[in-house]
Amino acid sequence: MTDDRIIGAGATREDDAADASIRPKRLADYLGQVPVREQMEIYIQAAKGRGDALDHVLIFGPPGLGKTTLSHVIANELGVALRVTSGPVIEKAGDLAALLTNLQPHDVLFIDEIHRLSPVVEEVLYPAMEDFQIDIMIGEGPAARSIKIDLPPFTLIGATTRAGLLTAPLRDRFGIVQRLEFYSVEELTRIVRRSASILGIDCTADGAGEIARRARGTPRIANRLLRRVRDYAQVKAGGHIDEPVAQAAMKMLKVDPEGFDELDRRLLKTMVDYFDGGPVGIESLAAALSEERGTLEDVVEPYLIQQGFLVRTARGRMATHKAYRHMGLKPKNPPQDLFAEVPDVG
């Protein structure tokens, strides 16, 4: 299920093209994710000092937080080539073998959506990661035979938004595991200002902060909003972005101070107006909104839940006090305290 909204975290073709021009090349330029950055700096320096390939790295976390960017930075810091592919693209064991046999010593192979590798491909990957060898079947039927091919030492970087779907044998073969967290407004403000500087956009600190506050903790969304605010400023404000201009642009884009768009607000309003705040089943909610169940579950709800505007219970979805306050309403049906004592009526 893709999220093509302006505040969607999934990558669009425009995002990919724009990101290439503003992507940091070094860890020093990789803003935010301080623990990850500090750890990777040590691991990279140690591997280079020993003359070894860096241990295999698993990077996981929500979309749009910089997993692909970090893989490019790691390869640049190591001074080696980066080969980029994704789980769904590697359909057969032979596809993976072709990638692996073309690697040079210490190269980095980046597999996005690694949780989508097929079991057959995974079986080939295990000895490649562990022993730098692969077994390939030559021929068919009774004449088929297995040959062992030695590989140069390399680093596999796997990225996934769904670490729970990785098989245990694959997960256990990564020596370094890094989780990317959502960014603070201050970190996103620095990212917006850096992107604006590279793209030649006249943007004040207050203007960058206004964009950052509505970016849902996600650099990809922040950079996308920056490009749209730039368009607005170019036509309406002489190309200058300050706080009032950013606010006016966000109003045009219908992105509110919480980073919600029309669909987010419509979901909360429907829950309050039609279902008295809940609990309401997902099918009923989807029917009331004329949206697919999958869209609500995979695209809309996660951020609302993460920010505390919505809760899932055994009986259905419920709007929280925070949701009522966001809409300027007094809670009609406050969510019950799950840990409240039940009165003794016996």
Curated annotation (Swiss-Prot):
Chain segments carrying region Small ATPAse domain (RuvB-S): 184-254
Location (main, coarse): cytoplasm
Name of this chain's protein: Holliday junction branch migration complex subunit RuvB
Gene3D superfamilies: 1.10.8.60, P-loop containing nucleotide triphosphate hydrolases, Winged helix-like DNA-binding domain superfamily/Winged helix DNA-binding domain
Cellular compartments per GO CC: cytoplasm; Holliday junction resolvase complex
Name of the encoding gene: ruvB
Natural source organism: Stenotrophomonas maltophilia (strain K279a)
Domain remarks: Has 3 domains, the large (RuvB-L) and small ATPase (RuvB-S) domains and the C-terminal head (RuvB-H) domain. The head domain binds DNA, while the ATPase domains jointly bind ATP, ADP or are empty depending on the state of the subunit in the translocation cycle. During a single DNA translocation step the structure of each domain remains the same, but their relative positions change.
Source organism superkingdom: Bacteria
EC annotation from Swiss-Prot or TrEMBL: 3.6.4.-
Function: The RuvA-RuvB-RuvC complex processes Holliday junction (HJ) DNA during genetic recombination and DNA repair, while the RuvA-RuvB complex plays an important role in the rescue of blocked DNA replication forks via replication fork reversal (RFR). RuvA specifically binds to HJ cruciform DNA, conferring on it an open structure. The RuvB hexamer acts as an ATP-dependent pump, pulling dsDNA into and through the RuvAB complex. RuvB forms 2 homohexamers on either side of HJ DNA bound by 1 or 2 RuvA tetramers; 4 subunits per hexamer contact DNA at a time.
Localisation: Cytoplasm
Alphabetized InterPro entries for the sequence: AAA+_ATPase (IPR003593), AAA_lid_4 (IPR041445), DNA_helicase_Holl-junc_RuvB (IPR004605), P-loop_NTPase (IPR027417), RuvB-like_N (IPR008824), RuvB_C (IPR008823), WH-like_DNA-bd_sf (IPR036388), WH_DNA-bd_sf (IPR036390)
Phylogenetic classification of the source organism: Bacteria, Pseudomonadati, Pseudomonadota, Gammaproteobacteria, Lysobacterales
GO MF entries: ATP binding; ATP hydrolysis activity; four-way junction DNA binding; four-way junction helicase activity
Keywords from the UniProt entry: ATP-binding, Cytoplasm, DNA damage, DNA recombination, DNA repair, DNA-binding, Hydrolase, Nucleotide-binding
Coiled-coil annotated residue ranges, if any: none
Protein residues bound to ATP: I22, R23, G64, K67, T68, T69, E130, D131, F132, R173, Y183, R220
